[in-house]
């Protein structure tokens, strides 16, 4: 009986260690990908703040419009002004670079007084904290979804659902 309990305990510990290692490896890969595209993230932050920080609204959300011909992001749709914002080639390239950091969908940018969030279908997000504080919520359909937060760099965080 002791052998069976020891065997079961060993299996449980093994699965736990493997699971933690997988998350660590996933995060290391995500951090490397972020670092490759960090300049694009930072330039987009600067662009977004210059263009939209003067708007009096608690949250600005933008979704992408993708060209049917090229498959590239060509404009943003503003849910605040209900209009399309056409992007020049340099900004389009920055969005394309940022998109390469995502394993899942990247289709939304959200700006609040405390953060700029890059995300999509609610599986993962890159968040820049404007107030220097760790993000406290994950932008997803299920507001109670369990998520993890990893610090990437000064004020940059990677958030992802624990069960995807």
Where are these regions (language model features)?
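Positively charged n-region of N-terminal signal peptides that target proteins for export
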Residues: 1-4
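Sec-dependent N-terminal signal peptides
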Residues: 6-11
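Bacterial Sec-type N-terminal signal peptides, specifically the leucine/valine-rich hydrophobic h-region
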Residues: 14-17
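N-terminal export/targeting and maturation segments
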Residues: 19-95
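Extracytoplasmic electrostatic interaction patches
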Residues: 74-164
């Amino acid at each position: 009986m002791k052998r069976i309990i020891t065997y079961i305990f060993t299996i449980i510990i093994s699965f736990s260690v493997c699971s933690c290692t997988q998350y660590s490896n996933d995060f290391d890969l995500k951090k490397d990908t972020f670092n490759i595209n960090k300049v694009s993230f930072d330039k987009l932050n600067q662009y977004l703040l210059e263009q939209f920080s003067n708007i009096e609204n608690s949250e600005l959300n933008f979704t992408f419009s993708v060209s049917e011909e090229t498959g590239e992001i060509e404009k943003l749709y503003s849910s605040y002004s209900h209009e399309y914002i056409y992007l020049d080639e340099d900004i389009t390239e920055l969005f394309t670079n940022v998109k390469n950091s995502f394993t899942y969908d990247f289709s939304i940018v959200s700006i609040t007084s405390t953060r700029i969030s890059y995300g999509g279908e609610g599986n993962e997000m890159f968040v820049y904290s404007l107030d220097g504080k760790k993000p406290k919520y994950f932008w997803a359909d299920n507001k109670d979804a369990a998520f993890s937060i990893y610090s990437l760099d000064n004020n940059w965080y990677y958030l992802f659902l624990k069960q995807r």
